[in-house]
Design a protein with these regions (language model features):
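Short, well-ordered, mixed-charge alpha-helical segments that flank or form enzyme active sites
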Residues: 88-92, 118-119, 125-128
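Structural motif
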Residues: 4, 40-41, 118, 216
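A structural signal for the main folded, soluble domain(s) of proteins
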Residues: 1, 9-12, 31, 261-266, ...
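Core catalytic region of metal-dependent phosphoesterases/phosphodiesterases
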Residues: 5, 10-111
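Active-site-proximal beta-strand elements of phosphoester/diester hydrolases
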Residues: 1-9, 115-122, 232-238
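Histidine-centered divalent metal-coordination motifs
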Residues: 9, 85-86, 120, 218-221
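Active-site-proximal loop/helix segment associated with metal-binding centers of metalloenzymes
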Residues: 121-200
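Conserved beta-sheet core of the metallophosphoesterase superfamily
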Residues: 97, 101-105, 122, 127-140, ...
């Protein structure tokens, strides 16, 4: 079995009872380890992750999570970590601490006879997005893409890594908290098949003959399972702090979406 999950946002100042949140995530991974061959984490497992040039004591809060990931590694379960927009600032530390394989870009894999496109989902837009959206939405997208470019700038990353961890973390965690509270106060539900950026992106890829059987994304914090073509489906994974949704691919190439409820799973109810 191959499992897919995303968006735990560990360490978030907007999530109450952080230790209970981390414990439930560990329970979820333990459940997966019973039959997992590999596990794909599609980004934003941390609300803020930065690897500084000096030791960062704040990362001790994630010790139980790291311990569980090392246990998975010892069992021979491969854990692949695709970075998102909250945790892209890893420079070898996660591989060393947690024994995961980090990937910084979307990837296409073939498993059990099926081709899968995996990505966190931030920054993926159809080519003609400027024609599709009204000015207010276009402006919002441009602002996000500018911010994304800043976050990925190697020189600016270097400067931030030079900060004392207590300074960098104070800013980073509070910025992430502000983002999370804004999302809670003004949630952005499923926009519909003709407006949801990731749906349009996946459909465009199919039109360009870049066929995949499954597209799997995180980022949007909505649970979506959509048939975009007769032989192609896309899934947005939801999250691992409120919805607790994940997907799994069995040895026959069947992809299903489930909800974790503290030791057991059930079929997820999807956005329409």
């Amino acid at each position: 079995m191959i499992y897919f999950l995303s968006d735990a946002h560990l360490g978030s100042l907007a999530i109450e009872r952080g230790w209970a949140h981390q414990k439930k995530l560990i329970d979820m991974l333990e459940m997966m380890s019973e039959d997992a061959v590999s596990i794909y984490m599609l980004g934003d497992m941390f609300d803020f992750w930065m690897e500084y040039f000096v030791h960062d004591k704040a990362k001790r809060q994630y010790s139980p999570f790291f311990k569980e990931l090392r246990k998975l590694h010892k069992k021979g379960i491969h854990v692949h970590y695709l970075t998102g927009n909250h945790d892209l600032w890893t420079f070898g530390g996660l591989e060393q601490i947690a024994k995961v394989e980090v990937q910084y870009e979307p990837c296409t894999i073939v498993r059990y006879g099926k081709t899968l496109f995996l990505a966190h989902g931030d920054g993926l837009l159809p080519e003609n997005w400027e024609e599709l959206y009204p000015p207010k939405v276009r402006s919002k997208i441009r602002s996000f893409m500018r911010l994304r470019k800043i976050f990925r700038n190697p020189f600016l990353q270097f400067l931030y890594r030079c900060l004392p961890p207590e300074v960098g973390n104070k800013f980073g965690y509070n910025w992430a908290k502000k983002s999370r509270l804004k999302e809670i106060e003004n949630p952005c539900p499923y926009k519909g098949e003709d407006k949801e950026e990731l749906v349009l992106y996946a459909k465009e890829q199919e039109k360009l003959h870049n066929h995949r059987d499954y597209y799997i994304f995180g980022h949007r914090h909505i649970d979506l399972d959509l048939q975009i073509k007769k032989d192609s489906r896309m899934v947005i994974l939801g999250d691992c702090f409120q919805q607790w949704t994940y997907a799994k691919l069995d040895k026959h190439g069947n992809l299903t979406v489930h909800t974790f409820e503290g030791g057991e799973e059930k079929e997820a109810d999807h956005a329409q």
